[in-house]
């Protein structure tokens, strides 16, 4: 397996080298001189002239057998195309068919012409390739090569590691089986079988060398295109062979090998040559020659009439009568199970706009999947269709295996309903996250009578392996949030497209308008890595002991001991400060530490816990009340975060010219500065706001948080922002704007950043993963968020002074259902006095 994987990865990573080398060998084989003096065959003059040895082609047995072979090839090709149409998208069908049939045909013809010139030009070669080509194997390879996850080379290598041994055994068995035809004694069939054996061998070599390289190359060119991705999720179970079938194939191969050894025994006849008289047909008259020609023409015509009729029938059936359905394929045994889908269509009418009476009609289609029973990647059709076994037997299988891989979906649900399997552990027990989510949806829907509602919640085409034990539990699906972009927004001299995930209309458009006003001048930012905090609450017997404990911690030498214990828990967490709050005999130890590119809550909690264990050695009478005493303060509006900071402290500034204010915002600097003072400063102070001296910073913060996999609940603290506006410039017509955000809690590793979509948004910003220096990427993300907040603040303030807020929300954020028809039938009763 490792050898196959390494070979496949090599071919995928050295695409051009493998392709060029293969084509070079093809060119060499095609250019070799084959027509030597003794190899040129004699041709007969005239189509009606009888030639020696030619009559064998028109023997009755020969014609019947060849017609049967050609028809079988057409039927098998039709079967292959039908199955491929169900396996995946039409693109996999095209690529697998081209590379498995056309490439192998070209290479086999070149090799055959090099060694056996009489085999290279046989007219039944296309039928042979239809009969021996395994297009489904190429489709499986393509589906695995385009699955999500590792890089292209590793995906192709893993697929070849799973398919390589099976392909080797299948090729060996096919060569031995087809080789039996070479012992039939029918000349044409012998030639065809010899050519077919050669075709199988060359097709195998193309599959393990040329095909992986081409597949990797096509995948690189088509990366990011939705239509080129597989229609159903890929699982390694799709490629794993059935061990029982493999053993049967090995037994068959051994038996066929014995047949070949017996039939081809070298001393079965003298010199292995069967001698016999050679009959030649000598025409006696022109009438006999003409009659013989008619007979030959009729036999050939009858042969092709049968084949043409069959081919036309198959084409008509496939094009006009083939029913288009959705199928799910078990890739192990090519068993098909139909999945019927309900389609619910509704056509609501919406009125959108200001005073316009025009109606915008939209049609939405909701697809409700019929989930029971569905063929999952890890369960076979036999398991789904088999009779449900008794509870005791299923329970014994589950306890003996420690898993439910061999149980059907109905049997697993039965164990869940009887409380033998916890509902939250389905993914771990089944070993298949997607199947676990699907069965949980079934159980929850039946238990709470919400089947129809759950069916409307999407769950397919999502990598739940990244969610498990990292982001969410009891998963039943996912909610798609639209992601828009604002920009380009120039920050510190570099333009960025800012991804924002939101369902609030006008937010992205408003932020984009602010970015346009900022223009090429851009935003200048400064970032300070304050560090994440955690504040355990500890209690001492009395205030004297509490005072002694506080003094002990404040001592520099003792602090160094605590810092060493704290820092030992992580490669990145580094303790910066212990700020102590006192309430009677209770101490609140606010540990503040830098955490690299991670947001760092878990790091700081782990370090604080280890520091408390050390402190317990010096103060045995100390009691740990809680690892978090709300003095941190996490996910709550608190002045301590506003004053001392938490996470990243960011300050951004920019200057908007008077021209931009007039043309884009339709206002001036004095108006905006006056509104900012009255609204953001005086109004927030009158309301007693903590860190709320801004227009709507939380909007931009939360939208970017959702898009980039941050903790959305952290927006409570992270949205602390002070927006200031001042007039500036020679004539006092320009506007100087600053945004100060002292507690932006962000990270580019861990948490939701590991998910595919969120990671893509981080990649758009160029801050995915850990930076070259600790906290480099997280600090850059914090500065981009603050700059986006500044752009959004500008746009909203301009909309407020121009009374554009309601108008823009009516246009972008308010879709009113047309209730005119319902309103006509409303009767209003007015009570009499």
UniProtKB/Swiss-Prot annotation:
InterPro entries tied to this protein: HMG_CoA_Rdtase, HMG_CoA_Rdtase_cat_sf, HMG_CoA_Rdtase_CS, HMG_CoA_Rdtase_eu_arc, HMG_CoA_Rdtase_N, HMG_CoA_Rdtase_NAD(P)-bd_sf, HMG_CoA_Rdtase_sub-bd_dom_sf, HMGCR/SNAP/NPC1-like_SSD
GO terms under cellular component: endoplasmic reticulum membrane; peroxisomal membrane
EC number: 1.1.1.34
Region (Linker): 322-419
Catalytic residues (UniProt): 504 (charge relay system), 635 (charge relay system), 711 (charge relay system), 809 (proton donor)
Transmembrane region(s): 10-32, 91-117, 160-180, 301-321
Glycosylated residue positions: 680, 715, 720, 813, 825
UniProt pathway: Metabolic intermediate biosynthesis; (R)-mevalonate biosynthesis; (R)-mevalonate from acetyl-CoA: step 3/3
Top-rank taxon: Eukaryota
Alphabetic keyword roster: Endoplasmic reticulum, Glycoprotein, Isoprene biosynthesis, Membrane, NADP, Oxidoreductase, Transmembrane, Transmembrane helix
Compartmental location: Endoplasmic reticulum membrane
GO molecular function, one term: hydroxymethylglutaryl-CoA reductase (NADPH) activity
Main location: endoplasmic reticulum
Region (Disordered): 347-374
Xref: Gene3D superfamilies: 3-hydroxy-3-methylglutaryl-coenzyme A Reductase, Chain A, domain 2, HMGR, N-terminal domain, Hydroxymethylglutaryl-CoA reductase, class I/II, NAD/NADP-binding domain
Activation/inhibition comment: The activity of HMG-CoA-reductase is suppressed by exogenous mevalonate.
UniProt GO BP: coenzyme A metabolic process; isoprenoid biosynthetic process; sterol biosynthetic process
Record field: compositional bias (Polar residues): 354-365
Name assigned to this protein: 3-hydroxy-3-methylglutaryl-coenzyme A reductase
